[in-house]
Amino acid sequence: MVFRSPLDLYSSHFLLPNFADSHHCSLLLASSGGGSGASGGGGGAGGGGGGNRAGGGGAGGAGGGSGGGGSRAPPEELSMFQLPTLNFSPEQVASVCETLEETGDIERLGRFLWSLPVAPGACEAINKHESILRARAVVAFHTGNFRDLYHILENHKFTKESHGKLQAMWLEAHYQEAEKLRGRPLGPVDKYRVRKKFPLPRTIWDGEQKTHCFKERTRSLLREWYLQDPYPNPSKKRELAQATGLTPTQVGNWFKNRRQRDRAAAAKNRLQHQAIGPSGMRSLAEPGCPTHGSAESPSTAASPTTSVSSLTERADTGTSILSVTSSDSECDV
């Protein structure tokens, strides 16, 4: 379906009708504002044709005056020859807006909203329709007219079904303004500050705090896949996204964060082993301490070597607990 300006729906004869009745033709010229003088001059010429030139001129002037005064028609007659309008109902306009918004044709959607003729009295109903308001917000966002976008979002209450898209546009618009002001891309901390400075208006937010933590079932499924393959390819990310209800980007961020946590835990574990190793060697070198061989025998369970090994086990246990705890708190993905 091709949408064009409503003016394209009318041929040129609608603009300049070829009426056989000269009276209707004069009414059309009068409605344009420039035909009264011509029709008056014609009446003057007709009235002064039988006299002399002076009398003819006078009659022409009188005829011109009478012609100029008589060419005006009542408003109800002039309304017949004004530019025709399309009697679109608010529901029809909303349906077109929804279709263009879903197809992503923002340019055509903007032209449709700009050149839309409506029936008298329908403007108020159209301005209250959510689909039309959302379409205007989308056009304002994509054209960079953020002031109009903020005005629409702050002054009209939207249903929960529209909150997600409108919230994303609100935040992205403020991000772009902040980037333009600072002259550089925003980092995570910068975006956090922008969100704090420009909170979501209650017209597109139900007041509930949005949590960035995943549910336990989602985390469990992600851990299972992580143990099988810490580096999933894009197809596996899409498959896992469908299984968990997340987006492929969220899945990729979770795997990336989990790998970083595991690397940090492994590095901390190595540092603890390096710190425990020299102290254990010094304790073995002291007089009166059993040899390393006797430390491995069952009869030396209470030896200093055993205490060092138990300390190592406790350190390893603490590291593993720390690793699991930090890896399982998948927030801010």
UniProtKB/Swiss-Prot annotation:
Protein name as annotated: Homeobox protein SIX3
Binding region for DNA: 207-266
CC terms in the record's Gene Ontology section: nucleus
Skewed-composition ranges (Polar residues): 317-333
Location in the cell: Nucleus
Entry's family note: Belongs to the SIX/Sine oculis homeobox family.
Positions of region (Bind to RHO promoter): 233-235
Entry annotated with the keyword Membrane: no
Induction info: Represses its own transcription in a TLE4-dependent manner. Induces in lens by PAX6 in a dosage-dependent manner. Activated by SOX2 during forebrain development. Inhibited by MTA1 in mammary glands.
Species annotation: Mus musculus (Mouse)
Keywords from the UniProt entry: Developmental protein, DNA-binding, Homeobox, Nucleus, Repressor, Transcription, Transcription regulation
Keyword Thylakoid: no
Gene name per UniProt: Six3
Listed Gly residues bias regions: 57-71
Region (Interaction with TLE5): 73-120
